[in-house]
C-alpha cells in the first residue's frame, strides 16, 4: 500500500483572489477535497489491515473533521488573517498553508501506521495469532509509554498500576496455554485474544483516568517560592496530562525552561505540539500535572482555581485566540475592563492612546458583533495592554490581523516591553515574528526541542514581511 502525501490532494494553482465569494468557495472546495482524500485513505487502511488496531489514524481523522466543522462555521472571522491589505486581495497560499497544517498531522499518523506495519516480520495470512498478539502487545507498550507519572502520586495508584500489569501478563500466559492445549479454530483464537486485550485495556485506562484527575488537582504544598532576580518563570520536569474521562494523553513531557524578566518570548511549533498548553500553564490559565512551575515566586501547581484567578488578575494580561470579548460591552468598555484590573491607576496605559494605536478610535462605541475578526482581535490586544501587567501572554495574537495591522501591533508590543519592562510571551505560527524575540522556543511532541536566544533582535521595520 502506498504512503499518503499532501501532493495527492488537488488544489488550484491560483495564488490569490480579490473576490470574497470566490475565496470562500475555494476554501470550501479544498476542505471537502481534503476530507474526501483522508476519509478514503482511512477506509483503505481499515480494509488492508482489517484485523489491526487502527487507533491513531482514526483518532486524527476524527480530530480533523471536528476542526474542519469549527473552521467552516467561523470562517468569516479568519478573513483578515488571509487578506493582504497592501495588494487588496486574499492570499490562497496563506489559506492552503493554514489548512495543510491540519491535514499533515492526519497524513503523518496514516504513514506512521503504514511504516510500523511494513516492518512487521509476519507473513500475510487470513489470520495470524502471532501477528495479532504482537500488535496488541505493542499497543500496550504505547499505552504504558504515555502513563501518568509523578513522585507526588499516592502509593495506591502506583500499586494498582503494578497489579494490572502482573494481571495482564498472567492472563496472557493462561491464554497461550489454553490455545496450546486445545485445538481451537482461528476464529476462536481471535475472539479470545480480543477479549483479553479489550478487558485489560479498559482496566488500564480506568486507572490512568483516576491518576490524571488526581494529578490535575492542586497540591497541598507551600504556595510561595523564592523569587529569582533574573528568571521570572522557571519550569522543571513539567508534565501535563489530559483526559476525556475514557482515555488520557500526555500533552507536555518533561519540560525544563527558564525565562528571564523583561524578555519578549516567541513559542513556535506545529499544531498539536503542546505550545498552547505550555502557554496556559505558565500564565495560570491551567495547572501542570506534575513538576515545578514557579512564576514570579508563586508555586503554580499548588494554587487552586480561585487563587489562579487572583494571580491572573494581579499579574497577567492574556490575548485569546478567540478574542474573549464581552458581547454586551462596547469596544471602549471592553478595554476599560482590562484597565480596571490594574489596582494602581498610575500604571494603567491610556485607553485613548491604545484605541488610536490599534486603529479602533472611530469604532470605540461598537459592540463586538459589529466588528470583523481582525477588529475584535485588536480590541483584545488593547485590553491586555491597558492593564499594563507584569506579564502579557498571547495565543496567536496577530493571527486574525492583516499584514499592515500585524506590523503596527508588533511595534506596540515592543514599545510597551521597552517602556514598562514587561515580560511578553506569545504563541504563533508566523516564523518571521521570531526575529523580534529575545528567546525563541520550539515545541514538538510535548517537548522543548530547541531554545534560541537572539543576541540582536530585529525591529519590525527590519523584517521583509512578504
Curated annotation (Swiss-Prot):
Binding-site list for ATP: 269-276
Alphabetical keyword list: ATP-binding, Nucleotide-binding, Transport
Any GO molecular function: ATP hydrolysis activity
ABC transporter domain segment(s): 233-463
This protein's record includes keyword Repeat: no
SMART domains documented for this protein: AAA (SM00382)
Database matches in Gene3D superfamilies: P-loop containing nucleotide triphosphate hydrolases
Pfam families from the UniProt entry: ABC_tran
Classification lineage: Bacteria, Bacillati, Mycoplasmatota, Mycoplasmoidales, Mycoplasmoidaceae
Family membership: Belongs to the ABC transporter superfamily.
Protein name per Swiss-Prot or TrEMBL: Putative ABC transporter ATP-binding protein MG065
Top-level taxon: Bacteria
Record flagged with keyword Transferase: no
Amino acid at each position: 500500500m502506498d504512503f499518503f502525501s499532501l501532493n495527492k490532494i488537488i488544489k488550484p494553482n491560483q495564488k490569490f483572489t480579490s473576490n470574497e465569494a470566490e475565496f470562500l468557495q475555494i476554501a470550501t472546495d479544498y476542505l471537502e477535497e481534503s476530507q474526501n482524500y483522508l476519509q478514503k485513505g482511512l477506509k483503505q487502511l481499515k480494509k488492508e489491515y482489517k484485523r489491526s488496531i487502527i487507533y491513531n489514524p482514526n483518532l486524527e481523522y476524527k480530530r480533523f473533521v471536528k476542526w474542519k466543522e469549527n473552521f467552516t462555521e467561523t470562517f468569516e472571522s479568519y478573513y483578515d488573517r488571509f487578506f493582504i491589505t497592501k495588494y487588496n486581495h486574499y492570499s490562497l497560499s496563506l489559506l492552503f498553508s493554514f489548512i495543510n497544517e491540519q491535514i499533515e498531522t492526519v497524513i503523518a499518523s496514516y504513514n506512521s501506521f503504514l511504516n510500523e506495519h511494513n516492518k512487521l516480520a509476519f507473513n500475510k495470512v487470513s489470520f495470524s495469532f502471532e501477528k495479532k498478539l504482537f500488535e496488541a502487545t505493542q499497543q500496550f507498550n504505547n499505552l504504558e509509554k504515555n502513563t501518568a507519572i509523578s513522585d507526588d502520586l499516592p502509593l495506591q495508584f502506583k500499586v494498582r498500576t503494578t497489579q494490572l500489569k502482573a494481571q495482564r501478563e498472567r492472563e496472557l500466559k493462561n491464554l497461550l496455554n489454553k490455545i496450546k492445549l486445545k485445538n481451537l479454530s482461528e476464529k476462536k483464537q481471535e475472539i479470545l485474544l480480543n477479549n483479553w486485550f479489550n478487558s485489560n485495556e479498559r482496566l488500564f485506562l480506568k486507572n490512568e483516568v483516576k491518576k490524571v484527575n488526581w494529578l490535575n488537582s492542586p497540591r497541598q504544598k507551600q504556595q510561595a517560592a523564592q523569587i529569582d532576580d533574573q528568571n521570572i518563570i522557571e519550569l522543571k520536569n513539567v508534565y501535563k496530562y489530559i483526559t476525556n474521562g475514557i482515555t488520557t494523553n500526555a500533552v507536555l513531557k518533561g519540560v525544563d525552561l527558564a525565562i528571564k524578566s523583561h524578555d519578549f518570548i516567541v513559542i513556535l511549533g506545529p499544531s498539536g505540539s503542546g505550545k498552547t498548553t505550555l502557554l496556559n500553564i505558565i500564565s495560570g490559565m491551567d495547572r501542570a500535572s506534575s513538576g515545578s512551575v514557579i512564576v514570579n515566586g508563586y508555586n503554580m501547581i499548588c494554587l487552586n482555581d480561585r487563587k489562579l484567578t487572583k494571580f491572573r488578575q494581579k499579574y497577567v494580561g492574556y490575548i485569546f485566540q478567540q478574542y474573549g470579548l464581552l458581547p454586551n460591552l462596547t469596544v471602549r468598555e471592553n478595554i476599560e475592563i482590562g484597565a480596571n484590573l490594574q489596582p494602581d491607576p498610575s500604571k494603567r496605559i491610556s485607553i485613548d492612546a491604545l484605541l488610536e494605536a490599534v486603529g479602533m478610535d472611530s469604532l470605540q462605541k461598537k459592540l463586538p458583533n459589529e466588528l470583523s475578526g481582525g477588529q475584535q482581535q485588536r480590541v483584545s490586544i488593547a485590553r491586555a495592554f491597558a492593564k499594563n501587567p507584569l506579564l502579557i501572554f498571547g495565543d496567536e495574537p496577530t493571527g486574525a490581523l492583516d499584514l499592515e495591522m500585524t506590523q503596527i501591533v508588533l511595534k506596540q508590543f515592543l514599545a510597551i516591553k521597552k517602556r514598562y519592562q514587561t515580560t511578553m510571551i506569545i504563541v504563533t505560527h508566523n516564523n518571521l515574528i521570531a526575529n523580534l524575540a529575545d528567546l525563541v522556543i520550539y515545541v514538538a511532541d510535548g517537548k522543548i526541542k530547541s531554545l534560541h536566544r537572539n543576541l540582536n533582535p530585529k525591529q519590525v521595520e527590519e523584517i521583509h514581511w512578504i
